[in-house]
């Protein structure tokens, strides 16, 4: 899905998603139901420290969320200019890391 469009309010992995819609749709593909907004995702699963993060954890920031890939990177719907892509997990201050599986 890398390079697919960012669409505010979107939940389509092919036609466009925003950050929380992207995360929600990826996890739904694997049978895991998540709330729709970043703020509601801050309380799902179990909190872990960034040092304990493993691939598949979600990392939440102030108004943003991505899926941890390992090796210090997240996959996420970045913005309308960049679409879905990869960023360093520590590109900004982390609010919480949540383990869902």
Question: What is each stretch, according to the model?
Answer:
Residues 1-55:
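Catalytic cysteine-centered active-site loop
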Residues 18, 63-64:
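Short loop/turn microsegments at loop-to-beta-strand junctions
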Residues 32, 36-50, 63, 69-101:
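Aromatic- and glycine-rich peptidoglycan recognition patches
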């Amino acid at each position: 899905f890398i390079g697919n469009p960012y669409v505010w309010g979107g939940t389509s992995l092919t036609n466009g998603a925003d950050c929380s819609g992207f995360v929600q749709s990826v996890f739904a593909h694997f049978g895991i139901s998540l709330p729709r907004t970043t703020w509601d995702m801050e309380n799902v699963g179990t909190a872990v420290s960034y040092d304990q993060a493993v691939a598949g954890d979600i990392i939440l920031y102030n108004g943003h969320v991505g899926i941890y890939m390992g090796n210090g990177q997240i996959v996420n719907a970045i913005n309308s200019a960049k679409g879905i892509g990869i960023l360093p997990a520590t590109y900004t201050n982390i609010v919480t890391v949540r383990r869902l599986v």
